[in-house]
Amino acid sequence: MSDKPDVKEVESFDKTTLKKTTTNEKNTLPTKEVIEQEKSGGSD
């Protein structure tokens, strides 16, 4: 087996077969301010 990967399949890949997807917003981490607010019990 050689060190180089087999790229034959990648080179012949047809991009038109891919489906268009919509990207959803990922859950972002809370800011330091939000964390401090929740720690102090000011979430209500």
Curated annotation (Swiss-Prot):
GO cellular component term of the entry, any: cytoplasm
Gene Ontology MF term list: actin monomer binding
Keyword annotations: Actin-binding, Cytoplasm, Cytoskeleton
Recorded superkingdom: Eukaryota
UniProt record, GO biological process: actin filament organization; regulation of cell migration
General function of this protein: Plays an important role in the organization of the cytoskeleton. Binds to and sequesters actin monomers (G actin) and therefore inhibits actin polymerization.
Name used for this protein in its record: Thymosin beta
